């Protein structure tokens, strides 16, 4: 640095300064705002370090407080409308709410973007429900500080999260100079903030410290994985030269810029320039003329060079730094910003951070633009899921991530974060306290707590186990199942009352239909648990209906397009859900819509009827009569019953393709060979038919020698012994056969036969039981004993069925079955001790001394058995089944509530009538019973006889009572009713309410319910039909009292298998036992690679999961589709028309292009790559060449010499991003430097050759990107001018060598010095470069005691290996040995007197020698 240059002020002062806030609100006036006062722009790095040091000092975790985005707002010189500013503010709100955002603006009140930023902070920050890292940084000069002596600038409101960054200005600087300097400083602030200083330079306290001790904290070192850098983005709406300077700074530093093209005329010109640059007949000179003419009316005619540089910088690579949007796209500003960050920063190795930003801003469009699978590791996926799951408005991004099927693994931290961002009242009050009995909120999900959650979920789902596996939370990698993780996340979200997330995760589960039904059952149970909080109950019931409806819709969608696939799902066992099939799980979860579906009803009927089919003969007998007669007489089974033909038998044949792939399997014993096909069944059949005939009649052509050389078909065996087994090697053809009668085991094991046989015996049982009851007197003890035994067998059968079903279905789902067994048992006990074997002592204790009580119990038993028979057997009828359900619904919903209401009226009326009508009657149990009896019977009759005055009462009339408390009713007989007016009114009131109000209300309720429950009754009836089929599947083949024979035969079958089929449980005709262990494909043309693991039903589950994803996607997009088809078609036509106009223009101008516009190619040295031949006109970077896209080439590192390979920049796909990031970091470090030698970078982040375009991108044959230095050494010897000589090589050139290392010691110079006789110590001393390696000008002199080499020049040189991103640079160093002893004769080198150097060496080298002599005083 020259001594005459002023030393920049590097001071930094944190302070609180007063500012003048202008506005109409209450914030107008003087405000005190925290500020950082910079002495000069060169003090900016210190300010950045101060900011991040303060953040690190107050942080409780790594990178806390570091923003995700830094948005610079540029609108200097513009004026926006209130509506436009409101649109921009709404676009910025998504950033402030979704992620950590720092806004940078000028802060001036006449800057519209500054007002937008201030308004956004005031409207968003007070309403946030989570901690937000939001900061508004105002960068300006010290004119913003309020002062009495100068006119201070008015600033925007600084009351919320605002920091001033003030730079002192020079007193003599003009306004334009200060404005340009502040514009560059504002842009440099964003660039430097986007590159935080290394953690080694930031002090972080080990414990909480006061603000006064922040600066004394110790330093820490973080690993590169913890290096978080915010993404800088600029939003431009400027209309001045200063705004263009700031915009150019951003583009030159590779920061994406979003220009609001309709905000001002300058932005419109920029948009037009961008469009013109894409035209086919672009001409640079015409463009400059057009641009100047457009800028002149705006007073910006001298700014065309800035726009030209802007366009060159933004188009110097394959990255688009500038994006134009209009006001209609401001609502999607977050998506635009994320897309720009993806294109600009993903190439620098920051894809993970871009993906996390997209998750925070709910912008799933980036997922289709990058290889997410390569970036989604467990840590990043956990962070993304936490961002998405904790917010209901980010379901779109969550569904987009789940569509990629990432390897999800649930962690305790993830679930705890979800809990803290959810409705903690529901979770703590209902789930933890009420359901689990916890009195505290857990801080982690340990196995014990996870086990308690599993028990709760099992209880809520009525027995479905392993839905919340505690083993998932261990560190064992074997439990990392993504489908299990999705199930756990869905259940946890349900427990946190997050309905939207539950529906999304259910749609992406492995078995969406089954899992949705289970979640629906859990939601319904949670709704029941939260009955006291009606809003929770309503929300959970709605969620339950939505999940059940989603499962039904998905199932119906598949059934309408592919009924076979839907039916196959019903026959497929599900290992994660108790091994149930779909229908069983639907019954378990009370999913009536699924069971009522047509496909499920087909499955239920197949389960009920099996393969049994009744003949049409005789016609006059209905089917049920044929089944009953056949079941009783057995012989008609052979004549009236048939076995329904099975589906076409799928033989376990293997296709030739699979046989080709299955190398480990032996070929068939017989083969068919044909010259026309591999398998010729026709030739094989002809051979089988003609061979015996030709042998018998002597027409064997083979014996006569007339056979063809290539026979059309022949069959030969590999094993002669197996010829007689099957002469046709390719299987037998199916033949049409008559249906045969079923076997007795098939007939009696069919549920429909069990049903009709059981109903027949049940009717006989009821008749016999009724006969035993109506026998006079004590009846027949023998008959009663027989009927009790028969009843006991019925009870045993019911217990057996209930026990069998209770193995998988909890008893709480079968309350009627449990009640039936219990009531039956009570009646059996009472009849046993009262009638069959009377236990006299017990009866005497109970006060029962007559057989009448036994007859009463028997009568009620007959009633109960009759009604239970009605409800048990009636669901099979399609007429009476729905009717009984309707009656049941009316009774439960209307009549029960009516009874509660009328009971209140009856009891209150009974009290009032007793008090007013019979005031003197004593209150006894007999009186109470008679009063209630009259009140109850008044529902059906109107008996007023006991309320009228009888003759007896008239005779006992006393008149007015003499004493107040005696004979209040004026009758001597207390049982006489009072005839007063109040008594009349009380009675009339009761009958009016009872007869005129309550009965019509009940009828109205019945009428309304009967109309509304048709669909529900039909579903319930179909639901009961499945239960009926399941019950009779489990019943023994013969009903009571023949059940004992079934038990005896079952015991015999344990020793003999002769009748095993007769007593086997009939499960389902379409569900075979081998289906439980085989894979889902049933075709012999699919080869399964044995080395690849497959899960059972993997492909079927994948099919349903994809359909569920599509259904979820379509459901979410229905509300977003606003444009109709005609508008879309019109836009499509306009797009095609514009494209045709562009192509026509390009076609018409294709023949008029100049030769200079055409691209020619030439071979790049030492390679087979062709590079573009660039003419001299297009070579400078200042000239716009829109279609310039050179090939990218980097010489492989292996092709370099071994000593150079360690310096080569590896430009692989994995490493090129890191190279770009390093170059951007170098550029950011030089933002405040005044050195004009700073390299320019392309939009992609590679350095640009100062010589201009070369026609080749990459580093080419150079080992490094950027400058590849070749050092030239001017070694002088001699202390005076007459003896001065210089060292040259054999080619009479100054010694030179490529210098690729960056150390301060020059090893090649050391070897040269040693070669000419300098000692080792002196050679090392002369080779050590200065710390300040600036170029020494000719007017300076080096002292004689200075031994460091002098840096004479550093110049860019032309080289055939140069590319756009790598070039040659000559670095010249000089050293004077003066009077040191040297060797005069050196191999490869020689000493040349400086007086004879002209004409001997190259002129530019001679100039360097004389320059070296000058600075050394020679």
UniProtKB/Swiss-Prot annotation:
One of its GO terms (biological process) is apoptotic process. Keywords: Apoptosis, Membrane, Transmembrane, Transmembrane helix. The chain crosses the membrane at residues 617-637, 755-775, 782-802, 818-838, 856-876, 898-918, 986-1006. It is a multi-pass membrane protein. GO terms for cellular component: plasma membrane. It is found in: Membrane. Pfam families: TRPM2. GO terms for molecular function: monoatomic cation channel activity. Its main location: membrane. InterPro entries: TRPM (IPR050927). Plays a major role in programmed cell death. This is Protein ced-11. The gene is ced-11.
């Amino acid at each position: 640095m020259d001594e005459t240059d002023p030393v920049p002020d590097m001071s930094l002062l944190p302070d609180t300064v007063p500012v003048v806030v202008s506005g109409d609100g209450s914030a107008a006036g003087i405000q005190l705002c925290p500020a950082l006062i910079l002495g000069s722009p060169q003090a900016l790095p210190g300010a950045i370090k101060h900011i991040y040091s303060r953040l690190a000092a107050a942080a409780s975790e790594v990178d806390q407080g570091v923003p995700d985005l830094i948005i610079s707002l540029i609108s200097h010189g513009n004026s926006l409308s209130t509506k436009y500013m409101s649109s921009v503010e709404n676009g910025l709100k998504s950033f402030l709410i979704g992620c950590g955002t720092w806004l940078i603006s000028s802060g001036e009140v006449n800057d519209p973007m500054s007002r937008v930023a201030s308004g956004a902070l005031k409207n968003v920050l007070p309403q946030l429900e989570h901690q937000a890292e939001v900061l508004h940084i105002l960068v300006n000069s010290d004119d913003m500080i309020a002062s009495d002596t100068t006119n201070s600038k008015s600033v925007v409101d600084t009351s919320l999260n605002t920091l001033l960054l003030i730079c002192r200005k020079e007193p003599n600087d003009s306004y334009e100079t200060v404005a340009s300097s502040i514009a560059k400083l504002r842009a440099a602030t964003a660039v430097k903030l986007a590159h935080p200083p290394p953690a080694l330079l930031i002090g972080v306290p080990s414990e909480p410290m006061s603000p006064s001790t922040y600066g004394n904290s110790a330093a820490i070192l973080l690993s590169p994985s913890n290096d978080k850098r915010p993404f800088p983005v600029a939003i431009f709406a400027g209309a001045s030269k200063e705004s263009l300077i700031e915009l150019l700074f951003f583009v030159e530093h590779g920061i994406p810029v979003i220009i609001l093209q309709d905000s001002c005329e300058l932005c419109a010109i920029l948009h037009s320039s961008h469009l013109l640059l894409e035209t086919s007949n672009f001409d640079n000179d015409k463009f400059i003329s057009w641009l100047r003419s457009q800028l002149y009316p705006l007073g910006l005619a001298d700014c065309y060079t800035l726009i030209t540089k802007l366009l060159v910088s933004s188009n110097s690579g394959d990255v688009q730094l500038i994006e134009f949007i209009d006001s209609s796209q401001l609502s999607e500003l977050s998506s635009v910003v994320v897309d720009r960050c993806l294109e600009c920063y993903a190439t620098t190795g920051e894809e993970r951070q871009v993906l996390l930003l997209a998750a925070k801003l709910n912008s799933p469009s980036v997922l289709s633009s990058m290889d997410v699978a390569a970036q989604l590791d467990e840590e990043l996926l956990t962070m993304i899921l936490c961002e998405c799951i904790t917010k209901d408005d980010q379901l779109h991004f969550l569904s987009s991530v789940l569509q990629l099927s990432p390897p999800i693994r649930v962690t305790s931290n993830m679930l705890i974060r979800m809990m803290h961002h959810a409705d903690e009242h529901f979770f703590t009050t209902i789930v933890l306290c009420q359901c689990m009995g916890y009195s505290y909120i857990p801080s982690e999900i340990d196995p014990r707590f996870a086990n308690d959650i599993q028990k709760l979920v099992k209880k809520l789902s009525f027995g479905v186990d392993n839905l919340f596996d505690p083993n998932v939370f261990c560190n064992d990698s074997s439990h990392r199942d993504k489908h299990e993780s999705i199930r756990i996340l869905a259940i946890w979200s349900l427990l946190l009352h997050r309905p939207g997330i539950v529906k999304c995760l259910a749609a992406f589960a492995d078995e969406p239909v089954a899992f949705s039904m289970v979640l629906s059952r859990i939601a319904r149970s949670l709704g029941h648990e939260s009955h006291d909080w009606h809003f929770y109950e309503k929300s959970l019931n709605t969620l339950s209906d939505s999940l059940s409806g989603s499962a039904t819709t998905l199932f119906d969608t598949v059934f309408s397009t592919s009924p076979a696939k839907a039916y196959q799902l019903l026959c497929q066992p599900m290992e994660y859900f108790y091994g149930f099939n779909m229908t069983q799980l639907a019954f378990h979860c009370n999913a009536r819509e699924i069971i009522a579906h047509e496909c499920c009803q087909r499955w239920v009927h197949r389960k009920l009827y099996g393969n049994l089919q009744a003949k049409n003969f005789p016609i006059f007998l209905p089917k049920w009569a044929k089944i009953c007669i056949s079941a009783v007489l057995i012989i008609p089974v052979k004549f009236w019953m048939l076995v329904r033909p099975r589906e076409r038998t799928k033989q376990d044949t293997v296709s030739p393709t699979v046989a080709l792939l299955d190398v480990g399997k032996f070929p068939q014993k017989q083969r068919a060979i044909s010259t026309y096909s591999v398998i010729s069944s026709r030739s094989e059949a002809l051979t089988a038919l003609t061979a015996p005939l030709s042998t018998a009649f002597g027409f064997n052509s083979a014996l006569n020698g007339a056979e063809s050389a290539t026979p059309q078909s022949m069959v030969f065996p590999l094993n002669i012994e197996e010829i007689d087994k099957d002469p046709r090697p390719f299987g037998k053809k199916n033949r049409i056969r008559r249906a045969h009668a079923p076997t007795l085991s098939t007939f009696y094991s069919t549920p429909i036969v069990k049903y009709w046989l059981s109903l027949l015996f049940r009717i006989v049982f009821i008749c016999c039981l009724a006969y035993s009851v109506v026998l006079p007197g004590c009846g027949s003890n023998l008959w009663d004993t027989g009927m009790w035994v028969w009843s006991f067998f019925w009870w045993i059968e019911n217990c057996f069925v209930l026990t069998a079903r209770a193995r998988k279905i909890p008893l709480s789902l079968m309350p009627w079955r449990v009640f039936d067994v219990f009531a039956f048992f009570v009646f059996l006990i009472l009849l046993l001790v009262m009638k069959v074997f009377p236990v006299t002592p017990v009866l005497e204790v109970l006060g029962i001394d007559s057989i009448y009580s036994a007859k009463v119990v028997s009568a009620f038993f007959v009633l109960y058995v009759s009604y239970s028979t009605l409800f048990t057997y009636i669901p099979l009828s399609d007429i009476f089944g729905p009717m009984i359900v309707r009656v049941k619904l009316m009774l439960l919903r209307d009549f029960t509530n009516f009874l509660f209401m009328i009971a209140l009226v009856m009891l209150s009326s009974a009290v009032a009538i007793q008090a007013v009508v019979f005031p003197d009657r004593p209150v006894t149990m007999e009186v109470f019973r008679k009063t209630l009896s009259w009140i109850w019977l008044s529902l059906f009759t109107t008996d007023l006889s006991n309320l009228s005055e009888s003759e007896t009462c008239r005779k006992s009339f006393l008149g007015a009572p003499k004493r107040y408390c005696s004979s209040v009713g004026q009758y001597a007989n207390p049982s006489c009713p009072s005839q007063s007016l109040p008594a009349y009114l009380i009675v009339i009131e009761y009958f009016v309410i009872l007869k005129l109000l309550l009965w019509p209300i009940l009828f109205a309720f019945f009428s309304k319910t009967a109309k509304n429950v048709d669909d529900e009754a039909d579903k319930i009836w179909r639901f009961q039909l499945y239960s009926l089929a399941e019950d009779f599947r489990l019943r023994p083949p013969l009903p009571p009292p023949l059940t004992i024979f079934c038990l005896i035969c079952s015991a015999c079958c344990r020793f003999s298998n002769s009748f095993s089929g007769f007593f086997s449980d009939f499960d389902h005709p379409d569900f075979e036992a081998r289906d439980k262990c085989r894979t889902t494909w049933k075709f012999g043309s699919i080869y399964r690679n044995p080395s690849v693991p497959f899960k059972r039903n993997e492909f079927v589950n994948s099919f349903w999961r994809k359909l569920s994803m599509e259904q979820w996607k379509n459901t979410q997009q229905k509300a977003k589709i606003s444009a109709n088809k005609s508008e879309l078609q019109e836009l499509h036509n306009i797009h095609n028309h514009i494209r045709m106009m562009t192509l026509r223009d390009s076609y018409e101008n294709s023949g008029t292009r100049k030769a200079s516009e055409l691209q020619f190619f030439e071979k790049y040295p030492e390679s087979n790559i062709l590079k573009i031949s660039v003419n001299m006109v297009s070579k400078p970077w200042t000239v716009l060449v829109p279609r310039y896209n050179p090939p990218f080439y980097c010489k492989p590192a292996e092709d370099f010499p071994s000593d150079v390979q360690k310096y080569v920049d590896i430009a692989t796909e994995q490493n090129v991003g890191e190279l770009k990031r390093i170059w951007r970091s170098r550029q950011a470090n030089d933002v405040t430097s005044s050195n004009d030698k700073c390299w320019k970078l392309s939009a992609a982040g590679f350095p640009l050759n100062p010589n201009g375009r070369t026609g080749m991108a990459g580093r080419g044959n150079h080992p490094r990107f950027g400058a590849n230095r070749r050092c030239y050494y001017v070694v002088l010897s001699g202390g005076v001018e007459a003896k001065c000589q210089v060292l040259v090589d054999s080619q009479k050139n100054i010694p030179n060598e490529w210098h690729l290392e960056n150390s301060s010691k020059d090893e090649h110079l050391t070897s040269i010095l040693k070669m000419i006789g300098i000692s080792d110590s002196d050679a090392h001393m002369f080779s050590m470069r200065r710390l300040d390696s600036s170029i020494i000008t000719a007017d300076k002199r080096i002292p004689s005691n200075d031994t460091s080499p002098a840096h004479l020049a550093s110049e860019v040189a032309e080289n055939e290996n140069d590319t756009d991103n790598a070039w040659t640079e000559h670095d010249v160093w000089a050293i004077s040995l003066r009077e040191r002893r040297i060797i005069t004769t050196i191999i490869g080198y020689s000493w040349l007197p400086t007086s004879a150097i002209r004409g001997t060496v190259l002129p530019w080298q001679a100039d360097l020698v004389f320059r070296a002599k000058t600075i050394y005083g020679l």
